Amino acid sequence: MSSGKIVQVIGPVVDVEFSLDQSLPDINNALVVYKNDEKKSKVVLETALELGDGVIRTIAMESTDGLQRGMEVIDTGKAISVPVGKDTLGRVFNVLGDTIDLGSSFPEDAERSEIHKKAPSFDELSTSTEILETGIKVIDLLAPYLKGGKVGLFGGAGVGKTVLIQELIHNIAQEHGGISVFTGVGERTREGNDLYYEMKDSGVIEKTAMVFGQMNEPPGARMRVALTGLTIAEYFRDVEGQDVLLFIDNIFRFTQAGSEVSALLGRMPSAVGYQPTLATEMGQLQERITSTKKGSITSIQAIYVPADDYTDPAPATAFAHLDATTNLERKLTEQGIYPAVDPLASSSSALAPEIVGEEHYKVATEVQHVLQRYRELQDIIAILGMDELSDQEKVLVSRARRVQFFLSQNFNVAEQFTGLPGSYVPVEETVKGFREILEGKYDDLPEEAFRSVGRIEDVVEKAKKLGY
């Protein structure tokens, strides 16, 4: 193994000089710097650029505090590798595969896998048309998820992306019963901590591996932590032949970290200050998240939308890789409708009669039509009032409002905030409920009875309590 010396440290960027008679490390190789002679404390660097004359520029995966010029840097000869296999379940890791959950550390001889890999070849890929039931009405009805598909949860700050992803973990991980991998990329440590203890209490943690590179970590760690989580998921798919659920919160932070790294490496920025390699980096990550003939990875990714602007290059680049999108809308949070999923902006390639069935498709398209017509009439209502509408339009508006409220429901993970029990609604019940609302069966019940309930039977019960 070749070794060099540190010649410059600029924040998370470390320049290392190797003598010209040695071979230089390959790009993406892991290099190690020991902070003291006992070799107890080390910093891992990743090769990013060759500057010429034997000098390479690296990105640190940890804080560079304590590094000095002249320190020895050892090339490991391979990329960062992380533990994989059944022993990772129930544990929490950082970007380097070190355990951070106060449990015992992994043995040195544990099976490990490199985080940089090629995506599966075209002939290995497999597609599925099986629906993944989430128990969340608005998703199951209007933008259903496919097993082995890729889903994006889009939304600005504070509209409920993380709560929605936690409810999906609660519902799918418990119902699905398979293996899950949760990757926290550049988000709040507090949320990760809450999620860990919640999963521990529910017992889901025994079938889940968790990987965190939170917002206080260097950009190198935030940029690579998604690959660490994906590597663990790929092993379960390819070697164990499992169907894996991969949750990533938040893909935007992966892009943001890449932007920071790109600037530190001296690359010319592209549109809106993003890295010129944005599409390439996103493609390298997303193309590995796929289903093969051996097993599947169903991924659910939260994607922050800066300033609620969907044309921003970061969410727009991620958009192209997804099978289904769940768009969260701030206007709905202002109306107190949770989850604040926009039923007209959200979409799914699975909403087709040959996949979901004729009745489901018919009810879903009718719901979209009613909501679209209601949106068009809102300007008239705001200016001239309800009296200017025809009798037919008044009935449509009345049903549209009931549909809109019925798309909301209480979450199990939000029970501590709302004081109301969460609900899991099977797809058949969801379709039945909306069909009966559209038929006018519940026109005599108050709109308020439809808000934040599960099944249609719960609406009737709530109406009785309200005195109807």
Curated annotation (Swiss-Prot):
Q: What is its EC number?
A: 7.1.2.2
Give the way it sits in the membrane: Peripheral membrane protein
What does it catalyze?
A: ATP + H2O + 4 H(+)(in) = ADP + phosphate + 5 H(+)(out)
Top EC group: translocase
Q: Which UniProt keywords apply?
A: ATP synthesis, ATP-binding, Cell membrane, CF(1), Hydrogen ion transport, Ion transport, Membrane, Nucleotide-binding, Translocase, Transport
Keyword Zinc-finger part of the UniProt annotation: no
Q: Which InterPro entries match?
A: AAA+_ATPase (IPR003593), ATP-synt_VA_C (IPR055190), ATP_synth_F1_bsu (IPR005722), ATPase_a/bsu_AS (IPR020003), ATPase_alpha/beta_chains (IPR050053), ATPase_F1/V1/A1_a/bsu_N (IPR004100), ATPase_F1/V1/A1_a/bsu_N_sf (IPR036121), ATPase_F1/V1/A1_a/bsu_nucl-bd (IPR000194)
User: Does the keyword rRNA-binding belong to this entry?
Assistant: no
- This one is known as ATP synthase subunit beta
UniProt lineage: Bacteria, Bacillati, Bacillota, Bacilli, Lactobacillales
